[in-house]
Design a protein with these regions (language model features):
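A generic secondary-structure signal for well-formed alpha-helical elements
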Residues: 13-17, 53, 62-66, 109, ...
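Catalytic core of Fe(II)/2-oxoglutarate
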Residues: 95-103, 112-234
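Conserved short histidine dyad/triad with adjacent acidic residue
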Residues: 62, 80-97
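Non-heme Fe(II)/2-oxoglutarate
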Residues: 1-61, 232
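A short coil-to-beta-strand element that immediately follows conserved catalytic motifs
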Residues: 65-75, 119
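Short, conserved, surface-exposed binding loops centered on an aromatic residue
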Residues: 47, 67-70, 79-80, 96-101
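Short, glycine/charge-rich beta-strand/loop segments that flank catalytic centers
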Residues: 25-28, 73-80
Length: 234
């Protein structure tokens, strides 16, 4: 985007105290999806990535037929990571909130100016599995990263080591069919980083138990709150 617009988006981000804190063994970050609570520019840029022309172009670049954006922002919206924040290696939930569509693409638009590579908070992808080194995709200002989501698309965010805030606008695209023939339904499943054996056992057990719940209750016991409830004003 034009740098001036990207700066406006960055300046429109709310304080982390006005966002939802997600802090556990799995992750430590701030997120928001109820976009009518924030600067209107943020909602505008999120849905700009859902414009039919943009969705079609991204689908063509990624060789995906008929991708569909998610107006509900299920796990999408905005996120902020401050010093000490992190996101452990994980697989994104395989479906949309109603389990009708397959999640196929993750769009991450980074808007923090002057975010140095040494600050951390970067996307890491693990194409050769968690026993091998990840590939780092730096969260540089005004950069859009598009990542495939499937049964083996392990990814993480490196710990933020800088006294600052890395801001991101995120979207997911869905499809009637999965990206690979191996794909099966799964909840968001976390693992630990290499060498963290005890943490890894805990996180794998956590994912196993949550999968067990979803086998009985298709949409889970409680509704995932991370969606944009547009009828809230009605």
């Amino acid at each position: 985007m034009p740098e001036e617009l990207a700066l406006q988006i960055s300046n429109a981000f709310p304080k982390k105290e006005a966002m939802v804190l997600k802090k556990s063994l799995r992750e430590y970050k701030y997120v928001a999806a109820q976009m009518d609570q924030y600067n209107p520019l943020l909602e505008q840029v999120i849905y700009a990535f859902q414009d039919e022309r943009i969705v079609k172009l991204v689908g063509e670049i990624c060789s995906i037929e008929n991708p569909e954006p998610d107006e509900n922002l299920y796990a999408g919206g905005i996120s902020l990571m401050a010093e000490g924040n992190f996101l452990n290696p994980h697989l994104d939930n395989s479906h949309d909130k109603n389990r009708n569509k397959w999640r196929v693409l993750n769009l991450l638009y980074y808007v923090t100016p002057n975010w140095e590579d040494s600050y951390g908070g970067h996307l890491e992808v693990w194409p050769k599995g968690l026993d091998n080194e990840p590939i780092t995709i730096y969260s540089r200002f005004n950069r859009l990263t598009v990542m495939a989501t499937h049964q083996k698309s392990w990814h993480s965010v490196s710990p933020v080591t800088h006294n600052g805030e890395r801001c991101c606008v995120s979207n997911y695209y869905f499809s009637d069919t999965p990206l690979t023939n191996e794909d099966q339904f799964h909840v968001t499943s976390f693992r630990a980083r290499p060498g963290q054996k005890i943490k890894d056992v805990i996180l794998q057990t956590d994912a196993f138990l949550r999968m067990g719940v979803r086998k009985v209750f298709k949409k889970g016991i409680t509704e995932n709150p991370h969606v944009y409830k547009k009828d809230k004003e009605e």
